[in-house]
A protein has these predicted regions:
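Non-catalytic cap/lid and distal C-terminal segments of serine-dependent acyl enzymes
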Residues: 2-3, 12-339
Length: 339
């Protein structure tokens, strides 16, 4: 199947243009270094009120990953896990659910463990074929589908039901992860993600995001453009694997409101704010084209999903915060809790 025939190629090319503009533990103060566990395990827990800061050893990446968990309102009984993935920055900076929204406060009274992994900048949370000189070893698909879930279930005494959310680049990742491990997450919500990655325009989108912004090399991710791994990891091509998962998929139009103008100017006053607004408009317009193509593919397969196509909206956090609120009933349904 050639996605270029489906693709809003002009929109994706617009996105390409807009995107262009081991922790060592010492023993008893000595010099000996603890041997890391051979299997995935929590190596430390720091509790800060209801927030638990976990260090989870990943055998596939041979390093510890920080995973922050907001415990449920009532932790005396099992609760489901809501995985909330950040975007391209992967929570390593301040571009995160925690720092750019109030969703953690909003979720504080919900009977759910809110899972916030930190790390994986520029990786698309996938399994890279080779170590990258800049981004290192990336085996995030293995981590999220095989290593982390059983560790969390054991540590948190969770209910075994899960939901997964992602925005921007991780809006692509959550669909890939759901296809890699059908049934692990009962609900998946993708906000402003470009699902098609294997046609030339989609490849360019991924390439510019990972290479231009994060400094990695997508050849180390999926190989050259001719590699079949691009199609193997394309959520649109593999959409049949989403059957049976509750899906919430949203995108804006790229048309700004006055609040967008004010937001971008508050973040970067002057000409840079204008440039950033243009980027947010162009990227979101392209994302809408991707999302329409995903909808067409799911419709052709008879796979239901809940869609939110906003007539306005740029590629920025207030819209993703709104989308989380709007998708909450479906997320709660999948996790088996009251909405």
């Amino acid at each position: 199947m050639k996605l270029s025939s489906l693709c809003g190629a002009a929109a994706l090319r617009t996105a390409a243009v807009t995107l262009t503009a081991m922790v060592s533990v010492t023993l008893l103060g000595g010099t000996a270094v603890a041997t890391p566990p051979k299997s995935a395990a929590v190596t430390s827990i720091t509790k800060e009120g209801r927030t638990w800061h976990l260090k989870v050893y990943s055998p596939s990446m041979d390093k510890e990953i920080t995973v922050d968990v907001l415990r449920p309102a009532d932790d005396s009984k099992p609760a489901p896990n809501l995985y909330m993935l950040n975007g391209l920055d992967a929570g390593e900076g301040t571009a995160s659910w925690k720092d750019r929204t109030k969703v953690l406060d909003w979720l504080a009274d919900k009977q759910v463990n809110v899972i916030q992994p930190i790390g994986g900048r520029g990786s698309y949370y996938t399994d890279w074929q080779n170590p990258d000189p800049v981004l290192g070893v990336n085996k995030w698909r293995t981590f999220f589908t095989e290593e982390l879930p059983p560790v969390l279930d054991k540590t948190l005494q969770s209910s075994g039901r899960n939901a997964l959310t992602g925005l921007s680049t991780s809006g692509t990742s959550v669909l890939q992860l759901a296809e890699a491990k059908p049934g692990l997450w009962q609900t998946v919500a993708a906000y402003s993600g470009c699902a098609q990655i294997s046609d030339p325009a989609g490849q360019q989108y991924v390439k510019l995001a990972t290479e231009l912004w994060a400094g990695g090399n997508t050849v180390n991710m999926y190989g050259p453009a001719s590699s079949p791994l691009w199609q193997d990891n394309d959520p649109v091509v593999n959409a049949e694997k989403l059957r049976g998962t509750l899906l919430y998929i949203s995108a804006g139009s790229g048309i700004p409101l006055m609040r967008d103008v004010q937001l971008y100017q508050s973040e970067a006053p002057g000409p840079q704010g204008v440039v950033n607004l243009g980027l947010g408009m162009g990227i979101e317009a392209a994302v809408k084209g991707c999302t329409v193509n995903l909808k067409n593919r799911l419709d052709s397969l008879g796979i239901p999903a809940t869609y939110q196509f906003s007539p306005v909206g740029t590629h920025n956090w207030p819209y993703w915060e709104d989308a989380l609120h709007e998708s909450w009933p479906l997320l709660a349904q999948g996790m088996g809790i009251a909405s």
